[in-house]
Amino acid sequence: YRAAWFGIFQNVLVIAWVMRAMAKIIIVVMGWEDGTTVIGIDAGVFTVLVLFLIAVTYTALSGLWGVVVTDVLQFGLAMGGSIYLAVATWSRLGGLDGILARFPGHDFNAVEVLRMLPAPEKLLAANPFTEFLLLILVVWWASYQVDGGGYISQRLFAAKNERHSVFAYLWFCVAHICLRPWPWIIVGLGGMALFGQVGDPETYYPMMMKEILPPGIFGLVLASFFAAFMSTIDTQLNWGSSLVVNDLLRRFIWKGKSDRSYILAARLSVMGLAVLGALASFALSDISFAWKLILSITAGIGSVYIARWYWWRVNAWSEISAMVTAGICTLVFAIMASTGRFAESPVTRFPYSTVITFLIVVPVWITVTLLTRPVSDERLKDFYRRVRPGGKGWERIRKAAGVEALPGTALRTASKIAAGIVLVFSTLIGTGSLILGEPGRGL
């Protein structure tokens, strides 16, 4: 069930929004109007499909090693391009003061736009401050990405040793969450200052590329976007095909076949996921809708992923019940939002609906866990001997396995988690505060 859910449904949704984003960029860059076609196909979609086929080809041929190697090169190219555009935007508009000077003519509050943290307002009411609190206190860890996700696990397992994997993940958190977004944000602010509310805000970035960059540099930055696009696509396809083949076909449908057969199945699954993602991209007009949907349909699953390290009773039904319940809640909120009575209610809007879903999902999966059969003691004991999870929740299994308790394991793990959260949030907010003219908070 998990393989089908994440490997196919969710994976296809992510691929679709990446394709749609790239299509929007290409349409702006090429100056195409809506309706422009190439060999009878929408011009933006046609170009993305060509790039997509290239990414699919080397993903299918190279496997995880090829994906990781190309990701390193593509990440460097993508970051270099985004940093250059951010610096050029900052210089062209005269820094923060220049951006502020251009805001008064627009229909939004420049102070609120440039505020690193929203101004405190009344709690338990629909406002930006409440939404901010919900995002940082609940949404980010309650969803499926709390453990990093499958493609992060792939890379951690492929590391030389545990020490390498720990430092790799720390670097990923800092680079991916704290540093990578800020060049994009600077360019986005520049786009808001220059273009205001003209056109689709999701196209401001390529509009800034055309406005700011000279021809040669423009080509390099555009190439960096292609690199980021293909890096994301090959990562998603490699992870998705590994779930489909190893967790679905090999275990339940196509058992006992040769390695060669499974390699062929992996390549075919890459092609299948690519086709599904391309088809799904045609249905997307708003990119943010896709990631909000994913956070909503996985709300509460993060609590299962955390609990399984501290409570031996968590089983497969815990995760399945959380997924099903979150999906049902998301569907119910979507139906409510489409009716006149609830159309304007914040209850049906992200992130309020996501948090409500989480509050429903948690008691459901705990109840299902207690009502279903636990994992066999032999498997739990084997897991405990290998991993040595801490806390009182594993005490029964520890005694059954005849293993000495590691003193302070749970406390040490909790302190490391807390330190990691503080590091990431402090670096993220501190960097932004320095950029946005709040040095006191930044330092």
Spans of features found by a protein language model:
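Membrane-embedded helix-loop-helix hairpins and adjacent transmembrane boundary segments
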Residues: Y1-L443
